């Protein structure tokens, strides 16, 4: 993926702001809808975590570093991979919209990722975020509304 327009995905969720925040920042919940191999996570500036995701023959060691936290409103983290150059910032913003909660996720490329790797094509990145935010997270929230 290259430094161009960020990928932005929005989703209305049938949950409170607090419940959405918990789903986004509590590692037990994150493992159920996001990445099941996340070893740990804390919504704290400076917190770092690392985990491996394999896709066929390729490995992607994810490195996250939390860069901004506004509880129940916003969390950002810097995202790199050990195996490949490139870096991005993922921003999750939540707000109230009538009786629902609006989640806006933005993935911004800071330094280009290799374009010859299929997982780094813009279409692949957009499809991944669409799946996570519009399918996986809402299903988790529907099943676990009282978590």
PLM regions: where:
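A solvent-exposed, acidic/Ser-Thr-rich amphipathic alpha-helical stretch
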Residues: 37-47
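Hydrophobic-ligand binding "helix-grip"
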Residues: 40, 55-102, 108-112
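A conserved amphipathic terminal alpha-helix motif
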Residues: 109-147
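Hydrophobic ligand-binding cavity/cleft-lining segments
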Residues: 1-39
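Residue-level preference for beta-strand/loop junctions
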Residues: 4-5, 45, 58, 86
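Extracellular beta-rich ligand/substrate-recognition surface
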Residues: 1-4, 52-56
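Hydrophobic pocket/interface hotspot
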Residues: 20-21, 30, 49-51, 66, ...
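Generic structural detector for well-ordered beta-strands
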Residues: 8-14, 42, 52, 65, ...
């Amino acid at each position: 993926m290259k430094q161009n327009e960020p990928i932005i995905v929005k989703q209305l969720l049938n949950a409170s702001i607090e419940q959405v925040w918990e789903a986004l920042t509590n590692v037990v919940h994150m493992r159920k809808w996001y990445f099941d191999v996340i070893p740990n996570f804390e919504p704290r500036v400076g917190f770092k975590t690392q985990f491996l995701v394999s896709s066929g023959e390729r490995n992607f060691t994810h490195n996250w570093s939390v860069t901004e936290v506004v509880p129940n409103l916003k969390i950002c983290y810097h995202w790199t991979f050990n195996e490949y150059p490139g870096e991005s910032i993922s921003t999750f913003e939540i707000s109230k919209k009538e009786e629902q909660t609006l989640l806006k996720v933005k993935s911004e490329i800071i330094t280009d990722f290799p374009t010859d790797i299929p997982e780094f094509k813009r279409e692949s990145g957009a499809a991944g975020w669409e799946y996570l935010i519009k399918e996986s997270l809402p299903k988790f929230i529907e099943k676990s509304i009282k978590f």
